[in-house]
Amino acid sequence: MDMRVDRSGQVKILVFNIAGEEVVQLLNKNESQGNYRVDWDGKNTNGETVGNGVYFVLIQQLSGLTTRRVIVLK
């Protein structure tokens, strides 16, 4: 998934399931302003493949929050 960091600083990317439970943290570090690509391999924090369904990717950065919907189908 493509994303833009508007201002250099802390960027955190989390994936949640439809129940609002955190599935995995994809990123938590300082990034410079610019365009980035982040990939999710469809696995949870324990390395297990998640089930089919709708997931939400939360991108938190200094300029605010963005949420994206991801559908996993096997």
What do these predicted regions represent?
Residues L26-N30:
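Beta-strand-rich interaction surfaces with strong enrichment in secreted/lumenal proteins
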Residues G34-V38:
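Short strand-edge motifs at loop-to-beta-strand transitions and within beta-strands
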Residues V23-V24, V50:
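Generic structural signal for well-ordered beta-strand positions
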Residues M1-V15, Q25, W40, Q61:
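Glycine-centered coil/turn sites that cap beta-strands in beta-rich domains
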Residues R7-S8, S32-Q33, N46, G51-N52:
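Surface-exposed loops/turns
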Residues D39, T45-K74:
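C-terminal tail/sorting-segment detector
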Residues F16-V23, Y55:
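Short, glycine-anchored, charge-dense loop/turn motifs used at functional sites
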